[in-house]
Regions:
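ABC transporter nucleotide-binding domain
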Residues: 192-284
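Conserved ABC transporter NBD signature motif
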Residues: 76-87, 91-92
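Conserved ABC ATPase signature
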Residues: 149-153
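Conserved ABC ATPase "signature" region
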Residues: 116, 120, 127-145
Length: 324
């Protein structure tokens, strides 16, 4: 088990540690005439949980495939664990744990057999595979399902097994591509708990996600990607403080009313965003915004005052919501 101090240190730092486990400078990926990743820079420190946040097509998965040494870079430099993927790909992959966006489990094998066979790929002895499999089944809360065929597992169980399998080689860095896509809320929260336990152990996590709450829960630091570029970087709290107000007021009006609102909303908030189904008003005191709106005779059908999130950061940076 790795020492837990790097995780604690990383979470208290505003800048990357001097020694990076992963370092990219001008990292670029092209597919013919299309640029999927456009000259991005980032560092991942030991013990850090680092995220790539952005919509589908932003370049997140292409970046992860380059880090995982399964897709060559088209330009710039990339160093992983101090090595060059173009030269040291097999050595790097032996020290990584990879959780792809789509599960690649052997459906006809049992839960335990999936772990044992994967361990053999890394040259582990049968006894060592068995020991690690027992530990990982317990970690993934799948001990009671060890003899079940994978095809009989729920989506959340399959995802936990995929993560457990990626840990069989005791990796220094975990790569997780959209780890909770398609899972129900209960399964997502259970998976977050397992990943948080890995953070506590000091395992370095690198993940992609388009879920704002997931990024806020798991990431010490993240980059926001859009159209193949990095448009912002920082901790979730730093990004929200920099690009949003403390609170957001969401007002929904009857159909046809939105087009008549511009003059009536002017001056109510520091920033106003018009979405197809609602208006967002950014100000530190949401209740004061609601009172001022009512004082102007506005009658929204629904009112919601909430704290700002990374969704608001993305909207500020790109002019659209992450769901667009």
């Amino acid at each position: 088990m790795m020492d837990t101090h790097p995780t604690q240190a990383a979470s208290n730092q505003r800048e990357p540690a001097p020694v990076s486990l992963i370092q990219a400078r001008g990292l670029t990926k092209r597919f013919g005439d299309m640029t999927a990743v456009d000259a991005i820079d980032f560092d991942v420190a030991p013990g850090e949980s680092f995220g790539f946040l952005g919509p589908n097509g932003a370049g997140k998965t292409s970046t992860m495939r380059m880090i995982g040494c399964v897709s060559p870079i088209s330009g710039g430099t990339l160093r992983i664990l101090g090595m060059d993927p173009a030269v040291d790909g097999p050595q790097i992959r032996a020290r990584l744990g990879v959780v792809p966006q789509q599960d690649t489990l052997d459906a006809e094998l049992t839960v335990r057999e999936n772990l044992l066979i994967y361990g053999r790929y890394f040259g582990l002895s049968r006894n060592e595979c068995a020991r690690r499999a027992d530990d990982l089944l317990d970690f993934a809360q799948l001990t009671e399902r060890a003899s079940d065929k994978v095809e009989h597992l729920s989506g959340g169980m399959k995802r936990r097994l995929t993560i457990a399998r990626s840990l069989i080689n005791e990796p220094e860095v975990m790569l997780l591509d959209e780890p909770t896509t398609g899972l129900d809320p209960q399964a997502r929260h259970l998976l977050w708990d397992r990943l948080y336990r890995l953070k506590q152990r000091g395992t370095t996590l690198v993940l992609t996600t388009h879920y704002m709450d997931e990024a806020e829960q798991l990431c010490d630091r993240l980059v926001v990607m859009d159209k193949a570029k990095i448009v912002a970087e920082g901790s979730p709290r730093e990004l929200i403080a920099q690009y949003a107000t403390r609170e957001v007021t969401e007002l929904r009006f009857a159909p046809g009313v939105h087009d008549t609102l511009d003059g009536k909303l002017h001056g109510l908030a520091e920033r106003i965003e018009h979405l197809p189904d609602r208006v967002l008003l950014y100000a530190d005191d949401g209740e004061a915004v609601v009172a001022a709106a009512h004082a102007r005779g506005l009658q929204p059908e629904t009112v919601l005052v909430r704290r700002s999130s990374l969704e608001d950061v993305f909207l500020r940076l790109t002019g659209r919501s992450l769901a667009d």
